Regions:
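Basic, Lys/Arg-enriched alpha-helical interface segments
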Residues: 1-93, 101-105, 112-135
């Protein structure tokens, strides 16, 4: 049986909307937006296969509704950064790094994990985006 939030983030990404009923959300998700108006996490999600978007979207929704939540779904990375940990088909692992800002979950960076530890360049990029703001 699937999770209760099947495909909702995928639908929002596809339709370029993310303002769903947030009345029940404890930590509504927002995409980081660069000064140029780009939303790197949304772009990354759109490039993934539909089943991967669905899995990651369900995990983000779980965090939105159950925050604060810990392992195995969410882990603190320090410096105000957190990661949503998603297991994809074929043994692949995805991570979405976020920060908490003004009562929202700001999605800063997403990637497919290929090493045991989170690469420093991914952490540095997320931290740079956090410092820039853009929520």
């Amino acid at each position: 049986m699937g999770r209760p939030f099947l495909g909702t983030l995928t639908a929002c990404i596809k339709n370029d909307t993310f303002s769903m009923n947030s009345g029940l959300k404890r930590l509504p998700a927002r995409f980081y937006q660069s000064d140029a108006g780009r939303e790197p996490v949304r772009e990354w999600l759109k490039a993934l296969a539909p089943e991967d978007r669905k899995t990651i979207g369900e995990d983000i929704k779980d965090v939105e509704f159950a925050w604060p939540i810990g392992m195995p779904l969410v882990r603190s990375l320090g410096n105000g950064l957190w990661e949503v940990r998603s297991s994809l088909s074929g043994g692949r692992i995805a991570r979405v790094i976020f920060t908490e800002e003004k009562g929202a979950m700001v999605l800063l960076h997403g990637f497919i994990k290929k090493t045991r530890t989170t690469p420093k360049r991914d952490l540095d990029l997320a931290l740079k985006r956090k410092k820039e703001g853009g929520a």
